[in-house]
């Protein structure tokens, strides 16, 4: 099951990967700067609407996955929507924890999860395009097969029963 919270080992491992440049600028970044009122409102909107959008993405992904579960290719966009919803909810949760300043792990977590959400949306869009193209190709193939089958069943002048209609009109 995908958790909305990262475990502590993952957070510690990520913090250890900071480059020297990030470590040198850390004291400057640790200063507590208050954000403007519009930035605080934006964080509030991200927290509120991000959570709602994340829940809707998870629900929509579940429905897409269940509706096309017959094929693995069809289920891939649904799974990607679920993953996108989880990362959007994580980003919204981090935005709610930021409380007016983006310093510390809340701001980093929000931006990291939002970046992952954007990547998942790219993969979702690409897989949806591929799925639609495959669907169009299959639909064209089915229509061609139906057309060939209908053409084969159409009576022609070579049919032995056609002599009834050649000389005498059916309705007089």
UniProtKB/Swiss-Prot annotation:
Residues 1-27 are annotated as: Disordered. InterPro entries: DUF5362. It is found in: Membrane. It is a single-pass membrane protein. Pfam families: DUF5362. Residues 1-17 have a biased composition (Basic and acidic residues). The chain crosses the membrane at residues 129-151. This is Uncharacterized protein YwnG. It comes from Bacillus subtilis (strain 168).
């Amino acid at each position: 099951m995908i958790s909305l919270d990262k475990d502590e080992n993952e957070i510690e491992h990520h913090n250890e990967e900071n480059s020297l440049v990030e470590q040198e600028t850390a004291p400057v970044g640790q200063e507590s700067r208050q954000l403007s009122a519009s930035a605080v409102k934006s964080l509030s909107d991200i927290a509120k609407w991000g959570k709602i959008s994340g829940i809707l993405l998870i629900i929509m992904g579940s429905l897409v996955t269940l509706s096309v579960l017959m094929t693995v290719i069809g289920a891939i966009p649904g799974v990607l929507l679920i993953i996108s919803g989880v990362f959007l909810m994580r980003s919204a949760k981090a935005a709610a924890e930021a409380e007016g300043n983006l310093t510390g792990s809340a701001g980093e977590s929000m931006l990291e999860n939002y970046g992952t959400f954007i990547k998942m949306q790219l993969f979702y869009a690409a897989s949806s395009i591929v799925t639609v193209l495959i669907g169009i190709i299959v639909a064209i193939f089915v229509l061609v097969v139906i057309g060939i089958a209908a053409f084969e069943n159409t009576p022609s002048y070579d049919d032995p029963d056609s002599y009834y209609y050649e000389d005498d009109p059916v309705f007089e």
